[in-house]
């Protein structure tokens, strides 16, 4: 009598594990990767955002959308059949600078604060559906800096103001002794921020001929702004009052002498 013997592989668990690993590798390999890069550009200059489909998948249409609170907003599409199609709200504002179904670049002609945000590029591929990537655009404004000083009776006020986006930071390069500092921050409707720092120096005479150095930090870069304190602008209030009083007294004496002289002349026969 024959017996049917079924031999099970000794390493069946390892074989099954290997199958699962291979399936996972195939699945991961099949996943399409989209490479993007965030950009930071200056206000009122051109800007570009790029998207690249890394895997050799067949894309049929490329769509760019702007992310918004409710739902993404279509901006522009590109396909071989229809070419570039720009939505009315974005005409004369953007264009697709790189025409391709694997690599796509949109260009803003002149960015404004409204253009700041994140954008999605969607590759509509055959067999894998829509594969998307996200690139974000940040808008900045270079600092506009003013530096001036003013003498008063017993102290010197030096003011440094910087307006930029994002908000700048203002420092002073001065000795620590006898100096007080106050800072005011003001946000503007156009998205910029003004930071004003005022130095109160108690011994103004010692600052004559020296430089007032204001340091502005913006986007990781520190810039020095210098101004030499001119003694021609310095005066002492008590000294000024003394001079004015002396001049007034001399004028009164002159008037009195002139009046007496003419009075004596009138009395002579």
UniProtKB/Swiss-Prot annotation:
GO terms for biological process: heterotypic cell-cell adhesion; negative regulation of macrophage activation; negative regulation of neuroinflammatory response; regulation of immune response. Residues 1-30 form the signal peptide. It comes from the Eukaryota. Disulfide bonds join 51-121, 118-136, 160-214. GO terms for cellular component: axon; cell surface; neuronal cell body; plasma membrane. It is found in: Cell membrane. The chain crosses the membrane at residues 237-257. Residues 142-232 form the Ig-like C2-type domain. Residues 31-236 are extracellular. Residues 31-141 form the Ig-like V-type domain. Glycans are attached at residues 103, 110, 157, 181, 190. Keywords: Cell membrane, Disulfide bond, Glycoprotein, Immunoglobulin domain, Membrane, Signal, Transmembrane, Transmembrane helix. Costimulates T-cell proliferation. May regulate myeloid cell activity in a variety of tissues. CD200 and CD200R1 interact via their respective N-terminal Ig-like domains. This is OX-2 membrane glycoprotein.
């Amino acid at each position: 009598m024959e017996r049917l013997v079924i031999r099970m592989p000794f390493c069946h668990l390892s074989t099954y594990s290997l199958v699962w690993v291979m399936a996972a590798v195939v699945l991961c390999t099949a996943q399409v990767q989209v490479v993007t890069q965030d950009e930071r550009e200056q206000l009122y200059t051109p800007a570009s955002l790029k998207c690249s489909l890394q895997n050799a998948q067949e894309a049929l249409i490329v769509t760019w959308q702007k992310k918004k609170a409710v739902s993404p907003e279509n901006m522009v599409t590109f396909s071989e059949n229809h070419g570039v199609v720009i939505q009315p709200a974005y005409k004369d504002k953007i264009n697709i600078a790189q025409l391709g179904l694997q690599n796509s670049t949109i260009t803003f002609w002149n960015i404004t604060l409204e253009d700041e945000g994140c954008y999605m590029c969607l590759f509509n591929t055959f067999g894998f559906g829509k594969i998307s990537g996200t690139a974000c655009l940040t808008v900045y404004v270079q600092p506009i800096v003013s530096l001036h000083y003013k003498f008063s009776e017993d102290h010197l006020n030096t003011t440094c103001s910087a307006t930029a986006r994002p908000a700048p930071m203002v420092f002073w390069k001065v000795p620590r002794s006898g100096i007080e500092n106050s800072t005011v921050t003001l946000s503007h409707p156009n998205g910029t921020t003004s930071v004003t720092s005022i130095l109160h120096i108690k011994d103004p005479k010692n600052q004559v001929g020296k430089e007032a150095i204001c340091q502005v930090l913006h986007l990781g870069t520190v810039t020095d702004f210098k101004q030499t304190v001119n003694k021609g602008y310095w005066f002492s209030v008590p000294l000024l009052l003394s001079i004015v009083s002396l001049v007034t007294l001399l004028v009164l004496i002159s008037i009195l002498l002139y009046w007496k002289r003419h009075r004596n002349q009138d009395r002579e026969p």
